[in-house]
């Protein structure tokens, strides 16, 4: 069992249950999944870009990424239906908590000019979305092997009913929010 998973089970869930006034422990909000998405639009011209993006994503997540293909053809972008244009990974259970631990304790502190996570990035249903502009902030990525600096989107899906509950949950996991 991962460190954060154990911490959630033994401490965080009990504190949240009392704070939110929930009678049943199954009602307490928890993190359901983390989805990481990397757009590789310039992979149309060069297959090596797609390969390096997939490699970096698998190093970061510890799981093989799924290639995302274009749904429609767009002539102005020289894009045809079915062309690979990105990759994504959905993390659950053990790997999710391990990734969350690395994200909060190692990656976020390494971001340049970081002033805290925006609290406006909640979607109204208790899910949090954030973007990372450089993949080199992750410790798994070797700076020497990086061909191009790429960003990624991270979506944290929770079972929380409101944004306030989700913010309390993520704050318990030591997410550095602004203010």
UniProtKB/Swiss-Prot annotation:
Keyword set, alphabetical order: Ribonucleoprotein, Ribosomal protein, RNA-binding, rRNA-binding, tRNA-binding
Please indicate if the UniProt record lists rRNA-binding as a keyword. Answer: yes
One GO term of the biological process aspect: translation
Q: Which InterPro entries match?
A: Ribosomal_uL5, Ribosomal_uL5_bac-type, Ribosomal_uL5_C, Ribosomal_uL5_CS, Ribosomal_uL5_dom_sf, Ribosomal_uL5_N
The record describes its quaternary structure and partners as: Part of the 50S ribosomal subunit; part of the 5S rRNA/L5/L18/L25 subcomplex. Contacts the 5S rRNA and the P site tRNA. Forms a bridge to the 30S subunit in the 70S ribosome.
User: According to its UniProt entry, what is the function of this protein?
Assistant: This is one of the proteins that bind and probably mediate the attachment of the 5S RNA into the large ribosomal subunit, where it forms part of the central protuberance. In the 70S ribosome it contacts protein S13 of the 30S subunit (bridge B1b), connecting the 2 subunits; this bridge is implicated in subunit movement. Contacts the P site tRNA; the 5S rRNA and some of its associated proteins might help stabilize positioning of ribosome-bound tRNAs.
Show the NCBIfam families listed in the entry.
Answer: PRK00010.1
This chain belongs to the protein called Large ribosomal subunit protein uL5
**Organism expressing this protein natively:** Vesicomyosocius okutanii subsp. Calyptogena okutanii (strain HA)
What is the gene name? rplE
